[in-house]
């Protein structure tokens, strides 16, 4: 049974659903115009929806804004600079790091300056092929700051898959790392990167390599050490972007065919994701949110990086696995230690935990009093796993559905 407190909170979340839903479909322009007032605009849009050429709709087409400004600078400007933006928790390397919004702004603006020094400008494409480390988030935001279009590829992805994305994007540079870590093994990125460039018809100008502490890669002539890359860079300001300019390219998972490159526009992306943090996930700016995914997938883009940072809350960046780093209690340890309010993950994670610890012995070791909601998506959530999670956690377990193509929930029991 779900505890009464959790059930009551779920009921309160759902109470306003019908009214909100009716407003959204009966007068979509007024609905989204009101919501759009919650983000920063250099120039507020005078036209909310252009439906002259269906199905190619345009939202906020004469508005101008910037993704990075809304994710970082705005919170510093509003006096929230000392608030924790990112909690990096890496059980696989036994390390943690907390980054405030002010620190994030400094790192991102300098990295963006380094990109500018390399000749990267608005509209250029940049591939990010990195593990789950803070530098990967800095790279994403650095691109967004100057209007470059990032294409994040899951770290350690096969060389032929990376090569196809190099050719598709015509990337100017690739941002990568010396390696990624899996339980019991190190995945060297350099050989994969080198092979991908050999396979690709398009050749990037440079590769910027972040050297992990315990594994250094040998660099070649077209490769630059990450720290050298940023050493003499000066911070740069955000570039004013049209709402229909492109934020990023991301590929579908390939579950229904050949992976497809999805291009995301800027304005609607910011407006929608910020709105979802409170209205679907019930997260407030003072809360800690955790999406246990990877930045190489849409869940990582939307709900590790952009959504929580647009909302000004704290997001957990997790480099590990549900089991094996070191055990099936790592999720409970992170929720307890960082006072996570809501967790978003895939059913596979809970199936793995259930298999390793069916009676929840690890769960019993931790205080999860901060924890209020579990959200599942990405694949079918089988009834046995749902019931097991509800019985163990005694909080609402909400299965919702969306796609890479949409970037946020299509169907959610909120």
Predicted regions: what is each one?
Residues 68-69, 86-141, 158, 162-163, ...:
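Conserved AMP-binding/adenylate-forming core of the ANL superfamily
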Residues 82-84, 207-210, 220-251, 258, ...:
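Conserved pre-ATP/AMP-binding loop-to-beta segment of ANL
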Residues 108-109, 231, 262-282:
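Conserved structural elements of the adenylate-forming
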């Amino acid at each position: 049974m779900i505890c009464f407190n959790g059930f009551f909170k779920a009921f309160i979340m759902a109470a306003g659903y019908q009214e909100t839903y009716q407003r959204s479909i009966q007068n979509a322009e007024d609905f989204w115009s009101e919501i759009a007032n919650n983000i920063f605009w250099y120039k507020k849009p005078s036209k909310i929806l252009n439906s002259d050429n269906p199905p190619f709709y345009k939202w906020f087409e004469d508005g101008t804004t910037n993704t990075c400004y809304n994710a970082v600078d705005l919170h510093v400007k509003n006096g929230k600079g000392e608030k924790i933006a990112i909690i990096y928790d890496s059980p696989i390397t036994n390390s943690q790091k907390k980054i405030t919004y002010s620190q994030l702004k400094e790192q991102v603006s300098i990295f963006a300056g380094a990109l500018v020094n390399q000749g990267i400008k608005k509209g250029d494409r940049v591939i990010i092929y990195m593990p789950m480390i803070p530098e990967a988030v800095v790279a994403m935001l650095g691109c967004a700051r100057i209007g470059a279009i990032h294409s994040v590829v899951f770290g350690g992805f096969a060389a032929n898959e990376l090569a196809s994305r190099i050719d598709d994007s015509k990337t100017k540079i690739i941002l990568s790392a010396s390696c990624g870590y899996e339980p019991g093994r190190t995945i060297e990125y350099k050989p994969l990167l080198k092979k991908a460039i050999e396979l690709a018809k398009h050749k990037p100008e440079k590769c910027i390599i972040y050297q992990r502490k315990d594994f250094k890669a040998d660099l070649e002539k077209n490769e630059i050490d990450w720290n050298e890359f940023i050493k003499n860079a000066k911070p740069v300001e955000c570039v004013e972007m049209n709402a229909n300019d492109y934020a990023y390219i991301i590929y579908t998972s390939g579950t229904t065919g050949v992976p497809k490159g999805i291009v995301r526009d800027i304005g609607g992306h910011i407006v929608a994701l910020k709105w979802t943090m409170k209205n679907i996930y019930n997260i407030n700016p003072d809360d800690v949110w955790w999406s246990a995914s990877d930045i190489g997938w849409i869940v990582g883009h939307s709900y590790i990086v952009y959504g929580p940072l647009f909302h000004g809350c704290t997001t957990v960046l997790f480099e590990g696995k549900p089991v094996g780093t070191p055990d099936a209690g790592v999720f409970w340890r992170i929720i307890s230690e960082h006072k996570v309010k809501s967790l978003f993950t895939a059913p596979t994670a809970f199936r793995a935990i259930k298999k390793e610890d069916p009676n929840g012995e690890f769960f019993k070791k931790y205080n999860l009093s901060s924890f209020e909601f579990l959200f599942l998506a990405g694949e079918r959530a089988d009834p046995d796993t749902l019931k097991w999670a509800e019985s163990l956690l005694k909080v609402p377990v909400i299965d919702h559905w969306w796609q890479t193509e949409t970037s946020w929930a299509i169907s959610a029991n909120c």
